[in-house]
């Protein structure tokens, strides 16, 4: 009887241990998945930002080529410029969507983190988790601040190059090109400063990814 009783205790202990392990692994896996999703959204937004800047460079080049005085191939250059303007506008809209998705994922990730954190009974673990979450939240908050300034500058630039495109579609003559040259030069100047405006956004995004990688933040959210 004693042997059976001991055997029953061993089996029960093993079953409880297995259940705890499965629950812990599931929680841990979910945390890592959310961390991976969050990092991926930031990477997508950063890649989109860099691609948009490259497209702005292409638009700058085609506009600069278009306003050269006394040129013969005006029609083809205008078509190239128009195509670049449309690409830039399309990429700017996609960038805005990517940044919105990134911020939504970040909010969900931190909310899930905080929810799990409240279940911790170990005060030192709860405190450590709270500090890591606060560090990530601080990094996240810098992205929308920097993004707003860049987005405003990009939208202003797009407005300029689109108005130039519209005017030249009405008057693609040497005189017409000459008349929009001051506006084009302003657009070129503003476009040239976009990279400087984008730099804080890129820095903020890279800080987020650095914080995500530091000390296994995904594991912390998952309850490790």
Predicted regions and their residues:
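Extended amphipathic alpha-helical interaction segments
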Residues: 98, 102-182, 199, 214-215
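C-terminal motif of bacterial Sec signal peptides marking the signal peptidase cleavage site
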Residues: 19-24
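Core hydrophobic alpha-helical transmembrane segments of single-pass membrane proteins
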Residues: 15-16
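Bacterial N-terminal signal peptides that target proteins for export
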Residues: 2-11
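Long amphipathic alpha-helices with heptad-repeat character
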Residues: 42-56, 85-88, 92-106, 143, ...
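Immediate post-signal-peptide N-terminus of mature secreted/exported proteins
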Residues: 26-90
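Long amphipathic all-alpha helical oligomerization modules
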Residues: 30-40, 155-224
């Amino acid at each position: 009887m004693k042997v059976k009783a001991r055997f029953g205790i061993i089996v029960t202990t093993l079953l409880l241990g297995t259940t705890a392990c499965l629950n812990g692994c599931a929680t841990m896996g979910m945390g890592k998945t959310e961390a991976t999703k969050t990092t991926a959204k930031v990477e997508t937004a950063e890649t989109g930002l860099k691609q948009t800047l490259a497209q702005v460079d292409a638009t700058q080049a085609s506009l600069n080529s278009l306003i050269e005085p006394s040129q013969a191939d005006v029609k083809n250059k205008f078509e190239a410029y128009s195509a670049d303007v449309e690409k830039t506008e399309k990429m700017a809209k996609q960038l805005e969507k990517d940044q919105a998705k990134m911020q939504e994922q970040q909010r969900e990730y931190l909310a899930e983190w905080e929810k799990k954190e409240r279940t911790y009974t170990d005060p030192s673990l709860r405190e450590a988790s709270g500090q890591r979450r606060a560090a990530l939240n601080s990094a996240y908050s810098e992205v929308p601040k920097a993004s707003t300034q860049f987005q405003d500058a990009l939208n202003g630039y797009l407005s300029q190059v689109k108005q130039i495109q519209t005017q030249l579609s009405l008057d693609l003559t040497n005189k017409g090109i000459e008349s929009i040259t001051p506006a084009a030069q302003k657009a070129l100047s503003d476009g040239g400063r976009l990279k400087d405006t984008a730099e804080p956004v890129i820095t903020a995004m890279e800080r987020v990814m650095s914080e995500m990688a530091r000390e296994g933040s995904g594991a912390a959210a998952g309850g490790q």
